[in-house]
Amino acid sequence: MNYTTSQIATIIKATCNIHTDCQLSVLLTDSRSLTFPEESIFFALVTERNDGHRYIKELYDKGVRNFVINYKPAEANEMPEANFLQVTNTLAAMQMLAAYHRRQFDIPVIGITGSNGKTSVKEWLHQLLQDDYNIVRSPRSYNSQTGVPLSVWQMNEKTELALFEAGISRPDEMHRLEEIIHPTIGLITNIGDAHQEGFASVQQKCLEKLTLLQGCDCIIYDGDN
């Protein structure tokens, strides 16, 4: 499923001057993962350890022409064919785009959360259901603020069922993941001590995880936990 540069700019409310309106299908956050430069849009994520803006010129030289940025790189004048979509927060913009993409599909979506076992349960469900449905699922343990948008972006016209993990490590994170995954079926594996250091109590963590399930038609949980 493709979006044009101008469509994405509108969805994420970016400020931009578009050189060429491209057809885009790949979200890129890691310059080392580049495979289809012409179809990629690079989100220059800024973290405590790294700044994606450092890799824009390298990616431009490899054929990428579409970039979501917080600020224009110093070498911008050396990239005359680049489409720079400027936003306040590149991660929030990617999450906004993924949430929009999710809303284009009216299919069962299973959101899986819990302190342990999310990936195992997701893979078990895939094994059980893959003969009956065309399934999209989170790659490996893509359950973070960055991983969930990349997972949801895989949904396409052939998808009949989606399985997505949602992991949190501190309060106020799950509401963003819920907006992106927007599950119709919620599954909680358990509530344990994992990532407890980010929460004042187990009850606080439990309530935060329940945020994922607020719009679900069906919730599955272990009655013994």
Which stretches of residues belong to each language-model region?
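N-terminal leader/targeting and accessory segments in enzymes
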Residues: M1-M96
